Amino acid sequence: MHRFTIFAGVVAFAVALVTGVTLAEPPTPNRDGAVPNEWLTPSERSDFQQTPRYDETIAFCCRLAEASPLIRVTSFGISPLGRELPLVIVSKGGATPTEAHQRDRVVLLVQNGIHAGECDGKDGALMLLRDIATGKIEPSLFDSVVLLVIPIFNVDGHERFGPHSRINQNGPQEMGWRTTSRNLNLNRDYIKADAVETRAWLKLWNAWNPDFHVDTHTTDGGDWQYDVMLAWERNANAPAP
């Protein structure tokens, strides 16, 4: 459980960072309150032994959208097997790329499940979105930020569920598969863009032009001594214009 809580905190920190909120003065409303049982995420309800399937994940996001005017659930494409690629938008008056750019919003993209068996990011993101919907995270953080969350990127691979997808990983009991239904690794496809999922993602990226991008992964049982590790680009990915 600790690593999921830390992940949600990392993303909350990223939101605070781009809004200029300092760690010395964190938002406090409702932060110490226990989460009501009806708002526990599917993974929390199982004591993190299970991760929700695609339909359950989308249904939980839609519940959050019904509970909070800040949250909207949409999609940015269709997978080869006909599943929508989900996108959750958290904003105040910047729910489209045009609105976000016109209002000079900072855009933060959090992407989960590019390797669908690596589900910690997805489950942590659902906790984060729940805390936003229930007021545990200060809404004023979104006066100047739009948060985009992709709960599951590799949706078809996610539904190739089984107990042996990542046999060295410490839970959950079952999880999705690394590659897509076309056996493509989306994390190796950004340039060649063979997958329809990648092409949809590139359209999303070009439309929103995020200022900050978080891409979550999970180790396959490696003992790294840390609950969460952060890595960032140190070099440009393309020549300067």
Where are these regions (language model features)?
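Bacterial N-terminal signal peptides
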Residues: 8-20
